[in-house]
From Swiss-Prot:
Domain of life: Eukaryota
Molecular function GO terms recorded: protein phosphatase regulator activity
Keywords, ordered alphabetically: Acetylation, Nucleus, Phosphoprotein
Region (Disordered): 1-63, 90-144, 236-270, 340-463, 531-557, 570-591, 690-897, 959-982
Record bears the keyword Metal-binding: no
Residue stretches of biased makeup (Polar residues): 343-352, 361-370, 389-407, 415-455, 578-591, 770-802, 822-833, 884-897
Organism, as annotated: Saccharomyces cerevisiae (strain ATCC 204508 / S288c)
Amino acid composition bias (Basic and acidic residues), ranges on this chain: 11-34, 247-260, 959-972
Cellular location(s): Nucleus
Protein's name in the database: Resistance to glucose repression protein 1
Compositional bias of kind Acidic residues: 741-758
One of the GO biological process terms: regulation of cellular response to glucose starvation
Cellular component aspect of the GO annotation: cytoplasm; nucleus; protein phosphatase type 1 complex; vacuole
Amino acid sequence: MSTNLANYFAGKKDIENEHVNRNASHESNSKSDVKISGNDNDNDEDMGPSVSMAVQAKNDDDFHKSTFNLKRTRSMGLLDEYIDPTKKLLGRSDDLYDNDNEYYDNSSNNSSSNSSDDDYDDGYQEHSTSVSPPPADNDSYLIPQDDNDVVVEPERHVDYLSHEWKESEISNSWKYIILKKKKRDVDLVNAARLENASWRTWAKARNNLKTVSPEVVNWSKDSDVTWLYGPIVRDSEGNAQSEEEHDLERGYGSDDENSKRISMPTKNSKSIAAAPKPILKKRTVTEIIEDNALWKLNEARKHMTEMKHASVIMDPNGNKNVHDDFDALAAQVNAQYYHYPKESNSSVSLKSQHSDKKDNSTIPNPVGENSNGGGDKGEEDLHLKSALHVQNNRSTAQSNKSILENSTNDRKANLDQNLNSPDNNRFPSSTSSSNRDNENNSMGLSSILTSNPSEKSNKPTKNRHIHFNDRVEQCMALRYPASQSEDDESDDENKQYVDVNNNANVTTINNNRTPLLAIQHKSIPINSATEHLNKNTSDDDTSSQSSSSSHSDDEEHGGLYINARFSRRSDSGVHSPITDNSSVASSTTSRAHVRPIIKLLPDTTLNYGSDEESDNGEFNGYGNAVSHNVNTSRGYDYIYDYNSVYTGDTSSFLPVDSCDIVDVPEGMDLQTAIADDNASNYEFNNAVESKEKHVPQLHKASANNTTRQHGSHMLLYDDDNYSSSSDSEQQFIEDSQYNSSDDEEEEDDDDQEVDDNHDEGLSLRRTLSLGKSGSTNSLYDLAQPSLSSATPQQKNPTNFTGGKTDVDKDAQLAVRPYPLKRNSSSGNFIFNSDSEEESSSEEEQRPLPANSQLVNRSVLKGSVTPANISSQKKKALPKQPKASDSSQSFRIVNNTPSPAEVGASDVAIEGYFSPRNESIKSVVSGGNMMDHQDHSEMDTLAKGFENCHINNASKLKDKKVDSVQTTRKEASLTDSSNESLHKVVQNARGMASKYLHSWKKSDVKPQENGNDSS
């Protein structure tokens, strides 16, 4: 392969011509077969994802014109001397893409020529995809590279003419430029300049040469500014440090030109200190040790806090007052130890105090002092700084300082006793003494590990640990009987000596480890302490007796008291009581006695973990400790220990016999049906019992009508079963679920009782028969349709036009939750009135529903004309109670215009309702009220009723004088049989909604004479 692309094209001219001739004549060439043998169209995938750019040229000129032109974007003719002028490529023709398919069309003619074309295309394929100068060394370009061939590219480019070079940087940059120049990856002209500049710079630095003046070389530096930017390669040994320094010099977002200007003034500055911290922090050994120490300190504090709250259990009725701010009181107590006059007496007393504390302390002394007090001076300084840190009030420190002088003299008197005593546990209560001493040492521990000797007094140390507080503080409200308020003054008098004594002696409130001190004490004269030197023993006994009396008195009344074991602190010599005079004087200004209302309980922690932790529990099951969040993606059961937080009696919450809580499946109602039935029966029975005395009933049409109805076994409905427990007018036709079986309906026939006993469910159904059924169904049957499979006597619906029984069983079993429109071939809904026990007076009191689609049909003489009425959608009741009584009648309340509540859809009334003026009944019956009607509208409805009439000749024989008129109407039914039933239904719906709501009791009685008219 040639090292130059142009020479490569020129040297391959003969081969290219052979390719062209071979493509034109479709002949094979042995020379191309030697180069690439065995190539076939099946091996096209070896070429990669590129599309073949082979072009079929007719002659040499066409070939040169259509060959690729490898353009150089920044060459500017710098490489023209390397290119043969006769072989300059003109550019790629646009018809190259149009001729792509020609190669593939001719490829099937000769396989050897295809192999040669593939070889030709391989030579150009690697150069056609680049817009920069391609590498001439094609062999190295085709070699696949792995991670070992990755070369770190320089991150910065500097001006080679003005940059201050290091010798290692010069050599590394020079090597990098030479390497890139050999691989033809850089501009050759610029690479030559960079190589020359780097070599000159290296020679200057190596030989310590001086810079040549610009005037010597005739260079106008001010006007002719020349830049020669190139890559700079850092030294690999100090790469990390140098890169960091140069990044700081360069600044964020600076370009190459500004980087040179920024780097000059920043070299002398402390750039490392001003550098921002990296995002990914790598902790040093110092930080690890410091964090570990802070963690240990936090654990020690946590332990001390737990011990403080645990001491409340030992003394739950301890001295509680408004000054139970442990932090503030601890600061006051520590101030009296560390703010002292620098005298020999106090120093000796403090030494004895600290040496005594070391023996009784349970927390290791962090200062490292020995029993001889060798480190007492350092400890005193640290304690002094700690006291300065916690001190908040300067005046308080002054008052404490005066008390300290008295206690210092007391400790001086008892110094020999403290140093010579072999037994360090001389306290009546060693536990409380140890707690107090541990608190004193803990202050020193806190000041050592958390404070800087020069800065801790001003600002606290940040806690870098991220942790979650699982501590639960608990308290309890205290209630006192009213009788205790009378004894408060006596309690205060009994506690005067004790309070003052304990305030001077720094007693422990509630047996906590935090020493407390009164805030409001006045300065006590020094001579009182001197006077006390002669009364040490007597005062000790007095304070003990006073404390004991106070303790017994407080135990009797449940108030505040201090145990006697805490009052005898004077034996230790560390704290000595003051004189009686000072006690009396200071008690007048001491804090007022305040009754506590809140009692602190021991704190607890939230316990949570996996199911393995619960295996050791008292119960095997999780019980109600299982998390109720069932939508979690945890791989274990999340346990929450409720008993650790609520310390009350939780025995009723615990499961029995390892009973676990399970999730209720979706769709299951936890409200039992038994509870609903009980509530429903209660409401329903009350409604029935309260309305039994006001039950209006439908009046029977006549004795003949009743005889005809039972003789023909029509599907009639008993109005004794018709009542309502609702007073709403929108609930005339509603779904109900009343199952009842009462004995007050024994006069009904047997078929009625069978239908009532099987009525259940909430749905609409068609009536089982029309006109020829042997069963008389009541209104209750419409509200409670029986299941067809449970009814032994199945009634087939009657065909509407022919009067025959419809044997379609689907119609029998149809239970529809929503009423459907009535088709001409479907059965009818009827509303029959069949009651043998009805009276005329009851019928007069019977109001009809307002919002219904019913058609009131008259009982024709000698015929029965049930009407076909369309269904109507109803609003369901919000509650659907059930009753065990299957024969409880739904009745309309006498004193309300509310409609009846029945469960039928659309029903046709067969029977007689006394009509009022301008009502449907009077018009259809054709009685005396005909003259008052709208003839055009009423005639249309009457004609519809005639069309719906079923021809039943057997029933015409039982009619009275009106048989001739009935026969004439049946003839009109035959003539108008082509009338659409849908139109009749619409007319009936409109007229029913217009007239049925206006029936009144006052209009019923005058219309009894028109029962038999049609």
